[in-house]
């Protein structure tokens, strides 16, 4: 029997445009607002101010140069059938580059006199990856068996982004992946050895951070069990300059995979399917969360209760915990 019974090669190159950017249709037209703050023309005859209604000011600046976003795409792949299609393989490599992305400029100085940041076709993102699937089929008498596996990997890179030059290159968005996080890097949890400990008459302890350690400026009272962050720029202070772009993985998974099994016998059919994601990171509580607490949604239906049990305490001063020392309010650390 022939080993290869099907082979199909595919290649495509194209260009597409996108005008559905989630904004209004007439972004290129200027707007004016009539509810601007009122103004006066001096003092009236009775001694009061001589007020004259609200003014008219320009809102959005005209942008007749706006155009569609452009995306250049390439795709190369093959379909392969083996052993009378008992094994069927589909593989694709794709690459695209999206440019002239419609966005509001972030680096226009206020001296320009614009009340709103102007819109412009600016920005470029490259995306590439592979997509593949494999099907296995076998019949034993009246029993039909099949299995299917899928795998997708994609990675993007921001080639052009409207940002001011950063003091430290590790904070720049350009050159990183879309939806990556800018975060502090946790070194470990503080221990009592990191502090000068004092105990008052009531037995309560106060902690003063040792001078040789980087000084946090994030707010709150620091103590054993709190997170000790990395002083990335080495200036002896933990502040916004120690936040690093690209810590962990993007919030959008780069890997999607799945596996399934099917069985059919005399009209009865059974199927199972598994699916997973990889190369992704999740922030507990969200990127802008001010902390979390039990019954945040009215009814505690999350894993937070389980996470909270695996936390640092004086009786469990472990570095291998999910949650650091708990506070009764937002401690900013």
Q: Which functions belong to the PLM regions below?
A:
Residues 55-58, 237-242, 328-332:
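Short glycine/proline-rich turn/loop motifs
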Residues 250-285:
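Glycine-rich, aromatic-lined ligand/substrate-binding cores of catalytic
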Residues 6-8, 152, 168, 279-281, ...:
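Short edge-strand/loop segments of extracellular domains
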Residues 94-99, 108-110, 276-280, 287-291:
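Active/binding-pocket-proximal capping segment
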Residues 1-185, 332-333:
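Extracellular/periplasmic, surface-exposed regions of secreted and cell-surface proteins
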Residues 62, 77, 243, 256-258:
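Short, hydrophobic/aromatic alpha-helical segments in well-folded domains
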Residues 24-37, 120, 139-249, 291, ...:
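Conserved small-residue
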Residues 131, 297, 303-305:
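Membrane-proximal N-terminal amphipathic helix
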